[in-house]
């Protein structure tokens, strides 16, 4: 799908028809999983070849940030959620050429959707492709800041459950959610680092107007301010995970202690019972009228004596 936008009164206006004449007036062409026919339209009408989705998966810096005859290329990660609401990353290709911005992605993304909504009423200042690119990155960082705030709030709720130490269904669910928050934080960190590298490359390779250069530097400062907050999330997750493992270990030790006490208590009575289970011809107690009650009493005493001794020593 091709979403083309042209400038009208310093605002982005969507182009309804994807003809060559209409596309030539576009300043931003946003492509979501384009078909081979749509790729051919761009190739024939604008002379622009697009990256493949396999190329978007390359993580080497030389393959993600470069400049060639097809323009300036940036491949950047954007935070999103998959169909099961788990944290995910989508790689987006940005290409700036002949005053146009081309974006290529394989799915709809919250940052793009939010920027399109804002662009209906928001005027561009410099009215060029780099401003649209920087605005998208700015929206991306705002989204990441919101994600960090959400994780902070979720960890606050999880800490109450985990630090309470009461194990059960809520405790197990908290552990599962904790691992999800760790995964979310790691993806946010990757997005921040990736955006930092992309903007640094953009500032080095282009001569941006003063306003846009300041905007790029402001985004970089925002990234630097968010990174410590995100790192503190990792520390909080690690603390809660260690606390949870500690409570689990204590509970396991308590259960093992119970089994140990039971085995110690019942071992002496078992010894008494095994003595009277021996098959000897001469066992005086067998002929004694009160032999059986005496054996039961001896077994009870053998069970109580070690329990009393261990209790007095403070071992239980």
From Swiss-Prot:
Homopentamer. In the absence of Mg(2+), interactions between subunits are weakened, and dimers, trimers and tetramers can be observed in vitro. This is Magnesium transport protein CorA. It comes from the Bacteria. Mediates influx of magnesium ions. Alternates between open and closed states. Activated by low cytoplasmic Mg(2+) levels. Inactive when cytoplasmic Mg(2+) levels are high. The chain crosses the membrane at residues 258-278, 290-310. The lineage of its organism: Bacteria, Pseudomonadati, Pseudomonadota, Gammaproteobacteria, Pasteurellales. It comes from Pasteurella multocida (strain Pm70). A motif (Probable selectivity filter) lies at residues 277-279. It is found in: Cell inner membrane. Belongs to the CorA metal ion transporter (MIT) (TC 1.A.35) family. It is a multi-pass membrane protein. It catalyses: Mg(2+)(in) = Mg(2+)(out). The central ion permeation pathway is formed by the first transmembrane domain from each of the five subunits. Mg(2+) binding strengthens interactions between subunits and leads to the formation of a symmetrical homopentamer surrounding a closed ion permeation pathway. Low Mg(2+) concentrations trigger both a conformation change within each subunit and a loosening of the interactions between subunits. This results in an open ion conduction pathway. In addition, this results in a less symmetrical shape of the whole complex. Pfam families: CorA.
